[in-house]
Amino acid sequence: MAIILGIDPGSRVTGYGVIRQTGRHLEYLGSGAIRTSVEDLPTRLKRIYAGVTEIITQFQPDMFAIEQVFMAKNADSALKLGQARGTAIVAAVNHDLPVFEYAARLVKQTVVGIGSADKVQVQDMVTRILQLSAKPQADAADALAIAITHAHSIQHSLTVAKQSSQAVSSEKEQILALMKTRYSRGRFRFRN
């Protein structure tokens, strides 16, 4: 069982979503947005840090997943987004949370099945996957999608590890059986 906090960073609106993963089952715990007003950037970053810290304190997540920065046409916007993202990551690291990063395209591919999905499609699929009674707001839905992507990544890693372990175990058993057969027939000769 793991509680995952997903963050969709932004210098004006930072979405968050919290889910609990138990095996393949995902449970919605909460979501929303940290909104900053038209203050100067340092004050907005301070609010983002305080907001993420409050969410971490409230939900006690085990893992922190955040969207990677994409290359924006406007360099100033990209820098502000990077600073907001860094602020959220610092809040997570200060609470000893492991940080996982996912590209927006991968998040959309994982949740919707199409890497170029729009916000409405993401909201619809998040609502279905988490069996919510109402659609979450766009920024919260994106954050929940990031958390779902991380949960999927964990489940996929466990499945691959289990399959690898079974394959190694099976191969080991085959080698031991072959060695027993050859040994019982006297085919092994030991040299000094």
Swiss-Prot record:
Mg(2+) 1 binds at residues 8, 139. It comes from the Bacteria. GO terms for biological process: DNA recombination; DNA repair. Mg(2+) 2 binds at residue 67. Keywords: Cytoplasm, DNA damage, DNA recombination, DNA repair, DNA-binding, Endonuclease, Hydrolase, Magnesium, Metal-binding, Nuclease. Its cofactor is Mg(2+). The keyword Coiled coil does not apply. It catalyses: Endonucleolytic cleavage at a junction such as a reciprocal single-stranded crossover between two homologous DNA duplexes (Holliday junction). The RuvA-RuvB-RuvC complex processes Holliday junction (HJ) DNA during genetic recombination and DNA repair. Endonuclease that resolves HJ intermediates. Cleaves cruciform DNA by making single-stranded nicks across the HJ at symmetrical positions within the homologous arms, yielding a 5'-phosphate and a 3'-hydroxyl group; requires a central core of homology in the junction. The consensus cleavage sequence is 5'-(A/T)TT(C/G)-3'. Cleavage occurs on the 3'-side of the TT dinucleotide at the point of strand exchange. Homodimer which binds Holliday junction (HJ) DNA. The HJ becomes 2-fold symmetrical on binding to RuvC with unstacked arms; it has a different conformation from HJ DNA in complex with RuvA. In the full resolvosome a probable DNA-RuvA(4)-RuvB(12)-RuvC(2) complex forms which resolves the HJ. Belongs to the RuvC family. This is Crossover junction endodeoxyribonuclease RuvC. The gene is ruvC.
